[in-house]
Amino acid sequence: MASHRLLLLCLAGLVFVSEAGPTGTGESKCPLMVKVLDAVRGSPAINVAVHVFKKAADETWEPFASGKTSESGELHGLTTEEEFVEGIYKVEIDTKSYWKALGISPFHEHAEVVFTANDSGPRRYTIAALLSPYSYSTTAVVTIPKE
């Protein structure tokens, strides 16, 4: 249990470090950013498919945005402040394809984070996932945009 807490603390620290702004870009105003880390290799998880869905009025999930993580394990530019309105969103990280590409048979098909966004006004969300073949851990950093 203590090692799990330490792992979560380290993950949260990495997220705070990445909040300073994406590496080498001017996308610090990105309202939704995803960061994926490989716990086995101790490195960013590169080229991981990420799909974002928004819950519709009829309770179904509608595709909202998608992309793949960069060399830094980050995915920016999923949406704009204007498009990212109040609602319930689901971030789905394709963990199976990532591990299969490394020759590993994983347990999970994907990692999933469902959250309510912008219900207290505009916010910026960083969703971070720490992956291993048989487990994953997620955390989020939610900040108020600076004008």
Curated annotation (Swiss-Prot):
| SMART domains in the cross-refs | TR_THY
Location of Sulfocysteine modifications: 30
An annotated GO cellular component:
extracellular space
- Posttranslational modification: Sulfonation of the reactive cysteine Cys-30 enhances the stability of the native conformation of TTR, avoiding misassembly of the protein leading to amyloid formation.
Q: Which UniProt keywords apply?
A: Gamma-carboxyglutamic acid, Glycoprotein, Hormone, Phosphoprotein, Secreted, Signal, Sulfation, Thyroid hormone, Transport
Q: In which tissues is it expressed?
A: Detected in brain.
Ligand binding (L-thyroxine):
35, 74, 137
Keyword Transport, does the record have it? yes
Please report a single Pfam family linked to this protein: Transthyretin
Q: What is its main location?
A: secreted
Q: Which residues are glycosylated?
A: 118
Q: Which region is the signal sequence?
A: 1-20
List residues, modification 4-carboxyglutamate: 62
> What is the superkingdom listed in this entry's lineage?
Eukaryota
Q: Which SUPFAM superfamilies match?
A: Transthyretin (synonym: prealbumin)
Where in this protein does the record say Phosphoserine is found?
Answer: 72
Binding partners and assembly: Homotetramer. Dimer of dimers. In the homotetramer, subunits assemble around a central channel that can accommodate two ligand molecules. Interacts with RBP4.
Q: Which protein family is it in?
A: Belongs to the transthyretin family.
Please explain the role this protein plays, according to its UniProt record: Thyroid hormone-binding protein. Probably transports thyroxine from the bloodstream to the brain.
How is this protein named in the record?
A: Transthyretin
**Which organism encodes this protein?**
Pan troglodytes
Supply the source organism's classification: Eukaryota, Metazoa, Chordata, Craniata, Vertebrata
